[in-house]
Amino acid sequence: MNTPKSIPSGTCRDTPVLKERGQREVFCGLTGIIWLHRKMQDAFFLVIGSRTCAHLLQSAAGVMIFAEPRFGTAILEETDLAGMADAHEELDREVERLLSRRPDIKQLFLVGSCPSEVIKLDLARAAERLTQVHAPHVRVLNYSGSGIETTFTQGEDACLTSMVPVLPTTDQKELMLVGALPDVVEDQAVSLLSQMGIGPIRVLPAPRTAETPGVGPNTVFACLQPFLGDTAAALTRRGAHHIQAPFPFGEEGTTLWLRAIADEFGVDDDTFDRVTAAPRARARKAIANASEHLNGKSVFFMPDSQLEIPLARFLTRECGMEAIEIGQPFIHKGLVGPDLDLMPAGPTISEGQDVDKQLDRVRAAQPDLTVCGLGLANPLEAEGLTTKWAIELVFTPVHFYEQAGDLAGLFSRPVRRRAVLKLEAAE
């Protein structure tokens, strides 16, 4: 079997973490609804929030409300915020109206926001009450997407965590893939694993409530995203076993992720090589073509999407880049530890954010590429730095072999663009 690169002796797992707890620049967890509502076809996400929440979702999703997407906002008015109206009665009325108009809804999520958190609206109690009213046709769950409690991708983690306690119990040995991916990418993963003889394979979240996976002591699960720490913990409490592995970004990460699952199911080396040889070769070729402008360049990750550590591993080991600092909102070593193990010590590893201090470090380092949020990119570009929007890495298919070249291309394009602009300026 073609083995990945050797693991360095001194790794980033041993690097002391710089913990920062200052001002931060990041989206709230409501943004997870943008991809979750597309994945879960008979679910509806009802945000209990303000007009700002509604505008965020509508503009980010690029969907007009009259198109009847699978999300909406129950607006908290001034009377609700002032305690002059019974918010629970109004919520019950809105849910009744929604479900009568949309009989296709099988699962309803009540999603908390900053305003609902501030007035201490008990959405957990509301979900229990509404489940009793609308069962068995509709199951009502709740989670928080509030910016007070969550950052960007944590919304998906909170959503999936809310589902785990109501998953059916099973004693069957099954593989559960945890995390929402575009259908075409998920199909690639399932196809590779199925060709190795691994199965049954279930997915959380399932596209329809009737296909919801069971969980029990014989369930093994692998996370598809590095921001699902609470979901992994909840599944473990239900008796499931977590397969730890680097995340499937690039050829190396995908191979090691598949290998960890294959080992769990007793797949021999010949079968593994037969299934993965061709896509691995395609991935290596695509990465080599796309990363030509990345080799020898430096990269600075500001905390945003929770993808930072696995992506830094991909860029340093497969694209020849040097990481100066790898910032991540939260570091869950139970998930990203295998990626940290593959990176040699050297980069600063930071958790959380104090944005002014971090900007000072960016300016001092002058990296060839800075991966950051939308609000920071344009000011840094104006200062002459090359940036990549972190949000693109969440909304673009980047997992597994067939997307490896596209992933490298996302980073190389801004570097190439900067080089062309410098050349034109010199002329």
Curated annotation (Swiss-Prot):
InterPro entries named in the record: LIPOR_BchN/ChlN, Nase/OxRdtase_comp1, Protochl_reductN
Cofactor(s), by name: [4Fe-4S] cluster
Source superkingdom: Bacteria
Keyword set, alphabetical order: 4Fe-4S, ATP-binding, Bacteriochlorophyll biosynthesis, Chlorophyll biosynthesis, Iron, Iron-sulfur, Metal-binding, Nucleotide-binding, Oxidoreductase, Photosynthesis
Keyword Metal-binding: yes
EC number in record: 1.3.7.7
Pathway annotation: Porphyrin-containing compound metabolism; bacteriochlorophyll biosynthesis (light-independent)
Role noted for this protein: Component of the dark-operative protochlorophyllide reductase (DPOR) that uses Mg-ATP and reduced ferredoxin to reduce ring D of protochlorophyllide (Pchlide) to form chlorophyllide a (Chlide). This reaction is light-independent. The NB-protein (BchN-BchB) is the catalytic component of the complex.
PANTHER family hit by this protein: LIGHT-INDEPENDENT PROTOCHLOROPHYLLIDE REDUCTASE SUBUNIT N
Protein name: Light-independent protochlorophyllide reductase subunit N
Organism expressing this protein natively: Jannaschia sp. (strain CCS1)
